[in-house]
């Protein structure tokens, strides 16, 4: 392919990016429909559609002329601005990586994941791991094979980690998790010996229609533009974005738990705030969306925990909670509510875990993923290994696979290597808070008096607007300096020492 000017080649690159974004939009709408409102036995027809779309997107991603566009631009980088240079860099990585995957395997994997999502949801509902196991076996095998395609000279699990956080590897994570354990385990031991916090009122009967009203209220508190972001209901909460003007978050409701959906909405709201804050200039390009999953989780965990579980936030929303649920919260004051939503104790469900024990849930999944990809753990043995690790890490027995290895949707979606992002994101958020406090003062303490606007503006300026322009490590260091997990361990120590009067 011949180009008369560099700008002509750049225009061709951006036309390709826009086309890929359009197909991604279509696939995303299909996925959203599948996980929210589609009848459970509709996966077969949808699978055919996904197969056709996957074939088209593979062909578009790997066309020889696209490689020529990239090569031409690589030889004329001095004529490009910084954004265009970054687009070329990302396009090269994506082009080379996709071309290494045989077309038939790429398409078959898309079909497999469509089926696996439906089978997983049914298996979870029926507490039937055996029905999901064959799909998980194929997903693990495919990820192991694709890891070799993506980064032939890299360890397979390290390769998968890099799909979610560039530059991440097992050594970094092993050291990080060791550092967390040194603080979390002894601190949890002290907490368990302290006077327990009464949170029984959070588990009374909370009508779902009232919880939906509460979710809408939380969206208002987070100052989310409902003309560009809405809430749907699904088995496992998640957020998806089609561009920075169209973001969808999902949640689930349990009549016997107020906090479950409350914190799902705030967590997913954090993801949504990030996507809505990306600069318009990156729309429909390969730089659209969040910088990485760890940076993304830093935003969701920041709003869920640092904001949403703070006393000022609880004080701000408590009148509305009392208004909606007067009988359930009779005799409960704001201090009791704040302490209850922060109660630390070993538990079964990751998404409902407290701040202190949450990373132990992530470590369990990390250890299992390493073994699955290395081939030292067989899929048939996943339930037993899951249960063993929960006994070892949290000292609890797992009664059912529904509450154990079937609780998360990630593996059915092929996202092996994602889980560490939650722990890294939590630590990133604590360091961001320290920098924010240094620059702005106590924004959390003044959250009802303009603090929410200030912290959102700070995150928007320093993190959100940049989308994928910077690599995740570069973005973080520009804002916070060198990553140091001690900010997170100090945050946990201070919070739970005060909360439990240790």
Predicted regions and their residues:
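Inter-helical turn/loop segments and adjacent helix faces that build the functional surface
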Residues: 122-130, 167, 190-199, 279-286, ...
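Contiguous, non-catalytic segments that form substrate-binding/exosite surfaces or channel walls
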Residues: 109-260
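C-terminal, non-catalytic "cap/extension" segments appended to globular domains
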Residues: 2-9, 25-31, 35, 41, ...
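A well-structured
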Residues: 1-166, 468-471, 493-502
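A glycine-rich, aromatic-flanked flexible loop/lid motif
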Residues: 234-236, 274-275, 331-343, 354-362, ...
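Active-site recognition of the HExxH zinc-binding catalytic motif
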Residues: 13, 151, 260-279, 297-301
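Secondary-structure capping and boundary motifs in well-ordered enzyme cores
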Residues: 45, 105-108, 135, 207, ...
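Post-HExxH zinc-binding segment in Zn-dependent metallohydrolases
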Residues: 289-330
């Amino acid at each position: 392919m011949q180009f008369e000017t560099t700008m002509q080649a750049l225009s061709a690159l951006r036309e390709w990016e826009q086309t890929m974004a359009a197909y991604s939009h279509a696939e995303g709408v299909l996925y959203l429909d599948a996980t929210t409102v589609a009848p459970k036995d509709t996966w077969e027809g949808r699978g055919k559609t996904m197969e056709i779309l996957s074939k088209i997107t593979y062909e578009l991603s790997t066309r020889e002329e696209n490689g020529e566009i990239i090569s031409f631009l690589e030889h004329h980088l001095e004529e490009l601005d910084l954004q265009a240079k970054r687009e070329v860099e990302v396009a090269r990585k994506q082009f080379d990586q996709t071309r290494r995957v045989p077309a038939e395997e790429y398409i078959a994997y898309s079909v497999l994941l469509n089926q696996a999502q439906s089978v997983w949801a049914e298996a979870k509902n029926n507490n039937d791991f055996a029905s999901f196991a064959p799909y998980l076996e194929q997903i693990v095998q495919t990820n192991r094979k694709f890891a070799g395609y993506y980064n032939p000279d890299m360890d397979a699990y390290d390769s998968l980690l890099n799909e979610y956080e560039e530059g991440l590897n097992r050594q970094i994570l092993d050291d990080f998790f060791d550092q967390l354990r040194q603080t979390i385990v002894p601190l949890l031991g002290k907490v368990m010996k302290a006077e327990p916090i009464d949170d029984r009122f959070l588990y009374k009967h909370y009508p779902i229609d009232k919880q939906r009203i509460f979710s809408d209220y939380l969206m208002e508190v987070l100052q989310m533009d409902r003309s560009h972001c809405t809430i749907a209901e699904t088995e496992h909460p998640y957020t998806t974005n089609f561009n920075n003007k169209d973001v969808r978050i999902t949640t689930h409701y349990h009549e016997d738990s107020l906090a479950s959906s409350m914190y799902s909405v705030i967590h997913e709201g954090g993801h949504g705030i990030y996507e809505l804050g990306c600069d318009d200039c990156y729309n429909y390009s390969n730089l659209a969306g969040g910088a990485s999953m760890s940076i993304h989780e830093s935003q969701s965990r920041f709003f869920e925990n640092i904001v949403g579980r703070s006393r000022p936030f609880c004080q701000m929303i408590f009148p509305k909670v009392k208004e909606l649920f007067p009988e359930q919260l009779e005799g409960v004051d704001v201090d009791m509510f704040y302490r209850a939503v922060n109660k630390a104790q070993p538990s079964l469900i990751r998404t409902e875990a407290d701040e202190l024990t949450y990373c132990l849930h992530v470590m369990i999944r990390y250890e299992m993923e390493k073994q699955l990809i290395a081939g030292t753990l067989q899929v048939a043995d996943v339930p037993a290994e899951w249960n063993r690790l929960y006994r070892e890490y949290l000292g609890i027995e797992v009664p059912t696979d529904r509450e154990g290895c079937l609780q998360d949707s990630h593996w059915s979606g092929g996202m092996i290597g994602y889980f560490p992002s939650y722990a890294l994101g939590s630590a990133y958020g604590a360091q961001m808070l320290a920098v924010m406090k240094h620059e702005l003062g106590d924004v959390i303490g003044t959250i009802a008096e303009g603090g929410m606007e200030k912290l959102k503006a700070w995150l928007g300026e320093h993190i959100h607007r940049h989308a994928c322009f910077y690599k995740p490590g570069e973005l973080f260091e520009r804002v916070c300096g060198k990553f140091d997990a001690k900010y997170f361990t100090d945050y946990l120590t201070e919070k739970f020492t005060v909360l439990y009067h240790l």
